[in-house]
Structures are given as structure tokens and as C-alpha cells.
Amino acid sequence: MPLIVFVIALLALFAIELMEPVQIWVIQPFTAAIAKVSAVVSQTFDSTVHAQGIVLGNIETGAAVSIQPGCNGVEAMIVLLAAILATPAGWKHKLIGIGLGFLAIQIVNVIRIVSLFYLLQWDPVWFEWAHLYLWQALIMLDGLIVYLLWVRMLPMVGDDPSSRAGDSP
């Protein structure tokens, strides 16, 4: 049953993400916010970086990366969300997993965007390799690790705190 829930949730969430109103009102503003956060992080050591919409750019060199669909962490979050929804657990635990998972994926994604921005300026060939192979795998691996850590922190089925050793009279 969890596999069926996972597949249905995955398909539904991806279908919702692709809807034009969701793209316009949720995904594009979210992606622009990720670009802004990436610029703020970069500005701590490079004042020439700025964000305009979904583009992270360098004012002096003109180098820029555009954060396109698939590069904003949304797909990794969808996979994690579907996995959490399919796992038997209480809603409190699911919401904690979703919240912490969102943070973990987006922190790694900002690191990804900033590193790719500078890698592009250093060597476009290495940028392409890191963008297409290394970081795609690492973002999904991040989601998997978050999921496994979340599952590990779930209480065991039938885990009654009063039945633990040392708690009985």
C-alpha cells in the first residue's frame, strides 16, 4: 500500500507542479526567491553578485546563471514529500519531516547554485559536468538522506513510553 500511495502522490504532485497557474503563482516566485537568497549568500564574499528574477549574475563580468525548472529543488522536494506521505506515521511527524526536508534540500540547493555560478565563470566544461551529473545526483541523495534520517527518528510501532526499561515501578 505505501508504494501505491507514493506513486499516486508523486504523479499528483508533479502534475500539480506543471500546471500553468502553479508555475506562475508559486514556482516562478519561489525560484526568484532562491536566486535572491543565493545572491545574498554570494554577497557575503563577492559584492558584484546580484539577482534579477530567476537569474544570478555578476555585475562586472556579465556572467550569469538562470535557475530553470529542475534547478530550484522543487523536484527533489516533491519526491521527498511523496515518500513522507506514503510512510505510515502521524501527521505531526510528517509535518516535521516535510519542514526539515524542505530546509535541508534548499540549503544544499543554494550551495549548489552558488558553486555552479562560480564554476561557470572558471570553466564552462566543468560547469556542464557538475550541473548535469554531480549536483543532480547530490540533490536527490540529499532528499534520500533526509528521508532515511526522518524514518529513523519515527517512533517504533507500539512504542509506549511507559513500557520502556526503567520506567516501570
Q: What is each residue range found by the language model?
A:
Residues 1-169:
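Hydrophobic N-terminal alpha-helices or hydrophobic patches in metabolic proteins across all domains
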